[in-house]
Amino acid sequence: MSGIRADGTGDVGLIIAVKRLSAAKTRLAPVFSAAARESVVLAMLMDTLTAAARVGDLRSITVITPDESAAAAATELGAEVLADPTRQGDPDPLNNAILTAEQVVSGSVPNIVVLQGDLPAMQTQELADAICAARAHQRSFVADRLGTGTAALCAFGSALDPQFGPDSSAQHRRSGAVELTGAWPGLRCDVDTPADLAAARSLGVGPATARVVAHHR
């Protein structure tokens, strides 16, 4: 058994794709230095992984990343780590990384959920409830709080067919994925901008994010 779940009793594999930290969250530049942004991104990943690890439906959690620091943090928390083989300059790096991870993870579980790694306010029960709702559909997704992006993509007995990128919510809908409508405010609150971070903090972020943000503000 791979990943964070110690007992491996679930039937879902979770995938989180993380880009190189030095290139992540540039829209947080108005409030954080480059070095601070890397720390914030890493902390958000740690809080996301920690919350996800308590979901009973998960058999494994896999992080695919080219970043050594992100890989080390994920490994320390018990996640399986895949080195992202996506070449620099690839026109669709995120979806290709997810497809690479899907090929590996689908060999051991019938169902896969892709989750954003920047959900510091996500509660374990929110993800558990979303996975429960997703079981009614072959492909489904959870839109972000603004309704334009995608916080999670779920595939039950089906290929993921990820459509992440600009307006990914609409892209996933057009591809046939069913939009899940639960409230799940923390699950929907991915952090790309200072406004997103403020929204996440108003919900309550995990301890790693709280410490790093307090240190750098």
From Swiss-Prot:
One Pfam entry name: CofC
Catalytic activity: phosphoenolpyruvate + GTP + H(+) = enolpyruvoyl-2-diphospho-5'-guanosine + diphosphate
GO MF, any single term: phospholactate guanylyltransferase activity
Keyword Nucleotide-binding: yes
UniProt cross-references to InterPro entries, sorted A to Z: CofC, Nucleotide-diphossugar_trans
Similarity comment text for this entry: Belongs to the CofC family.
Protein name: Phosphoenolpyruvate guanylyltransferase
